[in-house]
Amino acid sequence: MKKFAILFSIIYCSVFCNTLYSQNISDTVKDVVISIEYDKVCDEFHYVAEIKDFFSSKYNKGYSDERYGSYKYYEELHNEAYKEAIRNIDSRKMGTFIYSFIPDKHKRKLGNQGWGFIVFNLSKTEGLLKYSLTIRADEGIKVGRIFTKDDCLNIFHALDTSIFNSWSEDIDYLTGAIKFRLQDTD
């Protein structure tokens, strides 16, 4: 099971990376997207499976009639958990991709304020619907609406020519969040 998940993650990431490199995107953005969560498919699968009570632990991974009733039901749970794991990782990639478009002046202004979150809802047909950037610091600093109209147009263009093209046909809507560490710019 673990070997299959690792093999699938390598194939999935290779296809994703090839799609990105065939598009007209800056090397910086490509590096950001490609480097995020490269080998986390297996871990994410176990996380999702445990939440859904599909696996009781990382060490109890096998099928049993007693636990699942039928192998068909086991396969359904497995496929559902795996699909959700891939979707979660897609969400993280997308969040990182969007974060890479934040203007440097805003990154400098934020400075070393702790952890931040970018939350987004995306649709193939509607583009970037909603986003927010929250900085968690001692003072509870919150920063929002940091993209200009031109920034948004650049994001939409990059999404249209790269990420959306790599999505499965049946995925029209994606929502999620990316947590990032703000770097000290001094």
Question: Model features per residue range: what roles?
Answer:
Residues 1-30:
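Bacterial Sec-dependent N-terminal signal peptides
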Residues 23-186:
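Charge-biased low-complexity segments
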